[in-house]
A protein has these predicted regions:
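Catalytic cores of glycan-processing enzymes that make or break glycosidic bonds
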Residues: 6
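Domain-length cofactor-binding catalytic modules of enzymes
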Residues: 1, 9, 16-219
Length: 219
């Protein structure tokens, strides 16, 4: 869960060892990725790029409003091929709730994302209907986060932080991330893409295992 350690007689050789091991691991994973459908294959078909941007731009203000229930948040959106490969897949429902496997990822993205039960071409033009559908999803996420906190806290644990999601996934459209400023939201997006890469490689050679909840909380 923490990374790679390599050893040598000096710093340069140690660095070169790290690069070599990383390259060999990358080649090994890609060989296995090519042997079967990634994430079990695609379940959802993405909208065209222009339509994805339009859907995201329409929904983003509603998501931002709900994510800002405790403090003002700024959003970031990405619909890269790697993100779409994951959020459109058959494995999304299994992998997304499991959470991330690396402490660095978890600290930036929270324990798990919120997955929207919207179709890619969902009509998001009616404000009241959109809020009516989104609000229960956020309420469930907040309740789940509160349960996670209550079940794993220690006597000296700090107060529960903002219970709203950082990462929000919309199959067929893309990924939103929310944080206190644009840079932090963008970094959260990059970290979740890294988490996707970990899940992708793990599922190619074996089965993905997330960070144990208590260990995640202790971080």
């Amino acid at each position: 869960n923490h990374g790679l350690f390599t050893w040598a007689d000096n710093a340069y050789d140690c660095y070169m060892n790290s690069l070599e091991v990383i390259e060999r691991c990358s080649e090994y994973l890609e060989e296995h990725v090519a042997q079967k459908p990634v994430f079990g294959g695609q379940k959802v078909t993405s909208l065209a790029a222009e339509d994805r941007k339009l859907q995201a731009a329409t929904l983003a203000p509603y998501l931002r409003g709900l994510c800002s229930s405790e403090q003002l948040m700024v959003g970031h959106f990405t619909d890269s091929d790697r993100v779409l490969e994951f959020i459109n897949s058959h494995a999304l429902d299994k992998l997304a709730p499991m959470g991330t496997s690396c402490p660095d990822h978890f600290l930036r993205t929270k324990i798990r994302p919120l997955v929207l039960n919207f179709t890619p071409d969902e009509d998001v033009s009616d404000a009241e209907k959109v809020k009516e559908k989104l609000t229960p999803l956020f309420e469930d996420y907040r309740a789940s986060y509160k349960d996670y906190y209550e079940n794993h806290k220690h006597p000296n644990s700090p107060a529960m932080r903002d219970a709203n999601p950082v990462v929000i996934l919309w199959p067929g459209v893309g990924m939103f991330t929310f944080a206190k400023n644009k840079q932090t939201a963008r970094v959260a997006s990059e970290f979740y893409v890294n988490a996707i890469n970990v899940m992708r490689g793990s599922e190619a050679v074996s089965s993905y295992t997330s960070l144990p909840l208590q260990e995640a909380f202790n971080i």
